[in-house]
Every structure is written in C-alpha cells, then in structure tokens.
Amino acid sequence: MSDENDTPEELADISGVGPSKAEALAEAGFESVADVQAADQSELAEADGIGNALAARIKADVGGLEVEADTDAEVEEVGGDDEADTDADVETELRARGLTEKTPDLSEDEQRLLQKRRSVNTPQFNRQDYHKKKRTPTSWRRPKGTLSKQRRGIKGKGDTVEAGFRTPTAVRGKHPSGFEEVRVHNTDDLAGVDPDTEAARIASKVGARKRERIEEHAESQGIRVLNPTYVEVEVEDNE
C-alpha cells in the first residue's frame, strides 16, 4: 500500500514539477505520469523549461516505479514488452557536447613550439622545506637564507624559478590543444570569439541550463568549448 501511496497520480505531484512545468510537459506530449515513465531523459529535457537537470530529477522520481499487473496486461496487448527489452539492451556511453575534436589554425612554427612545450618537463617549483613542516605550503617562495642549499643551487634541493624555464612566447599561455582560452559567462560573450584561434571556457558559476544554451550557441558558431558537459547517448552498432 505504501508503494501505491508514493506513486504520483498527476504530473504536478512529481518531484520538481509544479503547475507551470506540468503544462510544459503536457504541451510537449507527456500528458500523464505513464508518458513520463516511458520517455527518455533526453526527450523530457527537450520540453520547454525542463532541461537536463530537472529531467534527471523527474526520471529519478518516476522512472523506477513498479508497474501494476493490469498495466502489464495492457502493455502486452500493445506489444510493449518487446520495446522494454529493447530499451534494456541498449548500450549507452558518456560523450561531450559540441566540437570536441576541432583544432586551431596554427602555423608550422607554432605547431613545432607547441610540441616542444609538451616534451619539456617543467619542475614543480615547490617552496623550500615544504615537506618538513605541515604548516609550510608548497606555493613557491624564493629562498633568501645565506646558508640555503636551494638558493645556492645544490643538486637535489629543488629548482628555483628562472627565465630559462619559460615556454616559447608564441605558445605561452595557450591551451594544450593550441587554442587561446576565452572565459565566457553567457552567449553574448561568444560574440568576440574567433573560432579559428580561440576556444571558450565556461565559467564555473554558470548553471546547467545556461551552460546548455552556451554550448548549443557555440556549436552553431563553430566554437569549441574546452570544458563541455558530458551527456549519456546510445551507442550505435555499425556491425
């Protein structure tokens, strides 16, 4: 009996769904709780004002509900068991949204310097004696003591920051892919991004819905996003 009482009877009874969201689901074709149960997360996310985060919450509340015996009989008449078996056998994987394989337009010299930067191991430049005292952080500070072995450059005492460790000027500060990073907070920030040489990095404070809009707009403009959202998609069998 407790399971029956926990089962949402109306769309507005679902966790995270109010009257306005229920109307949006109904307009998208999900007029009952059964329709929501049969839908995928991606299908629910396409409804106006739902998004991936709320779609996942809805599926968590509705997707695991047990189906009554009468409903099973009706589904068997329609042939729904075959569809359920098919859904259970579908393989999925996480894939990044957007143009993840896009590379920048670099000159031969920039490509050579970028490869050189990858092959050179830069020291960590830890603070002197950081491993001896717990209160000493690893952040770099130049040793100033007259007897400091690190200041005198004694082997094994750690490297000191010098100009010779800097990366080549042409590729300094660039992403490992070769793009110049541009921090964006909304779709308007993408207006000044050059898709051939620059890539967007979405700010960490941006929410899921706005992030999705930014990623869609960036893909339409041919701009690569360096920190894309990973979504679950079905794996197509090419055999």
Curated annotation (Swiss-Prot):
Q: Which GO terms describe its cellular component?
A: cytosolic large ribosomal subunit
PROSITE patterns given for it?
RIBOSOMAL_L32E (PS00580)
Q: What gene is it encoded by?
A: rpl32e
Task: Return the similarity comment.
Answer: Belongs to the eukaryotic ribosomal protein eL32 family.
Q: Which GO terms describe its biological process?
A: DNA repair; translation
Annotated Basic residues bias? 130-155
| UniProt cross-references to Pfam families, sorted A to Z | HHH_5, Ribosomal_L32e
What is the protein name given in its UniProt record?
Large ribosomal subunit protein eL32
Q: Does the keyword Ribosomal protein apply?
A: yes
Gene3D superfamilies on file: 5' to 3' exonuclease, C-terminal subdomain
Keyword Ribosomal protein attached = yes
Question: Which UniProt keywords are present, listed alphabetically?
Answer: Ribonucleoprotein, Ribosomal protein
Q: PANTHER family under this entry? A: 60S RIBOSOMAL PROTEIN L32 AND DNA-DIRECTED RNA POLYMERASE II, SUBUNIT N (PTHR23413), RIBOSOMAL PROTEIN L32 (PTHR23413:SF1)
Q: Where is the composition biased (Acidic residues)?
A: 1-12, 67-91
Composition bias, Basic and acidic residues: 92-113
Name the domain of life.
Answer: Archaea
* Native organism: Halobacterium salinarum (strain ATCC 700922 / JCM 11081 / NRC-1) (Halobacterium halobium)
Which InterPro entries does this chain map to?
DNA_repair_Rad51/TF_NusA_a-hlx, Hlx-hairpin-Hlx_DNA-bd_motif, Ribosomal_eL32, Ribosomal_eL32_arc, Ribosomal_eL32_CS, Ribosomal_eL32_sf
